[in-house]
């Protein structure tokens, strides 16, 4: 796990104090109290664990507040489908929700849009040429939907791939921001997503400080986008450190 027993669960909130430029939007801009009591620029604690599924090549469990997901990775293995020879491997991603994950989403069915977005987020970071003619399957399951589900899934999937020994250019982290009125709220929960005017999700390789994907919905001003990007970059850097600590602790435990 990323946190030792008895220790406080780490958070990846972006650093606001000490920045050269103050945030454009402040908590006082809107008479809004976050359901879980956090500040607008405060992320939920991130609990991470690898090796959650013993039968998988690699796996990870992530718990960000009430959002709980588990990701299993199988492979590289020979594809069951006949495929033309390729110098690079093949990546399959599947996202599903348990029946009890959410009153509205918990249908136990696959979510094709999330599966596609997870695939896009991961394919750019995996060294596909290291497993030609074979397939890596990523199965992501949302145990409990508590908000920012996709960003948690992407970060957890990256951790599971690392646990499986899949070669990557870097870990990949994902962070979401909701725009409600004039205020930006990082790592939104379900209630906040339900009344947001716009959503923003960024995936990046934290060690390289390189953005790999942006997903923006709703109406955003240029200052809004710039502020959201900085918040996500700061949070991604901290989340990357938490993920690397989790992998180090897992490796140390395996050596004992």
Swiss-Prot record:
MF terms (GO), sorted A to Z: 3'-5' exonuclease activity; RNA binding
The organism's place on the tree of life at top rank: Eukaryota
Subcellular location: Cytoplasm; Nucleus
A cellular component annotation (GO) from this entry: cytoplasm
Entry-linked SUPFAM superfamilies: Ribonuclease PH domain 2-like (SSF55666), Ribosomal protein S5 domain 2-like (SSF54211)
Gene deletion effect: Extremely slow growth, especially during the early stage of development.
InterPro entries found in the cross-reference section: ExoRNase_PH_dom1 (IPR001247), ExoRNase_PH_dom2 (IPR015847), ExoRNase_PH_dom2_sf (IPR036345), PNPase/RNase_PH_dom_sf (IPR027408), Ribosomal_Su5_D2-typ_SF (IPR020568), RNase_PH (IPR050080)
Stored Pfam families: RNase_PH, RNase_PH_C
Keyword rRNA processing among UniProt keywords: yes
Signal peptide: none
Biological processes per GO annotation: rRNA processing; seed germination; seedling development
Tissue: Highly expressed in imbibed seeds and young seedlings.
Gene3D superfamilies (UniProt xref): GHMP Kinase, N-terminal domain
UniProt entry keywords in alphabetical sequence: Cytoplasm, Exosome, Nucleus, RNA-binding, rRNA processing
Function: Non-catalytic component of the RNA exosome complex which has 3'->5' exoribonuclease activity and participates in a multitude of cellular RNA processing, maturation and degradation events. In vitro, is a processive phosphorolytic exonuclease and requires a single-stranded poly(A) tail on the substrate RNA for its activity. Plays an important role in seed germination and early seedling growth by mediating specific cytoplasmic mRNA decay of transcripts coding for the abscisic acid (ABA) biosynthetic enzymes NCED5 and NCED6, and the ABA signaling transcription factors ABI3 and ABI4.
Family from the record: Belongs to the RNase PH family.
SUBUNIT field: Probable component of the RNA exosome complex.
Protein known as: Exosome complex component RRP41-like
Lineage: Eukaryota, Viridiplantae, Streptophyta, Embryophyta, Tracheophyta
Name of the gene: RRP41L
């Amino acid at each position: 796990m990323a946190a030792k027993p008895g220790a406080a669960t780490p958070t990846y909130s972006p650093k606001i104090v000490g920045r050269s430029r103050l945030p454009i939007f402040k908590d006082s801009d809107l008479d809004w109290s976050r359901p879980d009591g956090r500040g607008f620029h405060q992320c939920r604690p991130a609990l991470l664990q690898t090796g959650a599924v013993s039968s998988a090549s690699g796996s990870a469990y992530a718990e960000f507040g009430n959002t709980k997901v588990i990701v299993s990775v199988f492979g590289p293995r020979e594809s069951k489908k006949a495929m033309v020879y390729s110098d690079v491997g093949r990546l399959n991603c599947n996202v599903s929700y348990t029946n009890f994950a959410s009153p509205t989403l918990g249908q136990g069915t696959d979510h094709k849009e999330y599966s596609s977005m997870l695939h896009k987020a991961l394919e750019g970071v995996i060294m596909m040429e290291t497993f030609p003619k074979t397939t890596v399957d990523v199965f992501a399951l949302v145990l409990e939907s508590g908000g920012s589900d996709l960003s948690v899934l992407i970060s957890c999937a990256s951790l599971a791939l690392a646990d499986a020994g899949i070669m990557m250019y870097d870990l990949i982290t994902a962070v979401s921001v909701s725009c409600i009125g004039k205020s930006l709220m990082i790592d939104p929960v379900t209630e906040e997503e339900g009344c947001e005017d716009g959503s923003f999700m960024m995936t990046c390789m934290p060690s390289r400080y390189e953005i790999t994907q942006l997903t923006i919905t709703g109406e955003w001003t240029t200052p809004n986008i710039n502020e959201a990007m900085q918040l996500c970059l700061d949070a991604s850097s901290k989340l990357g450190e938490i993920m690397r600590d989790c992998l180090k602790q897992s490796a140390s435990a395996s050596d004992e």
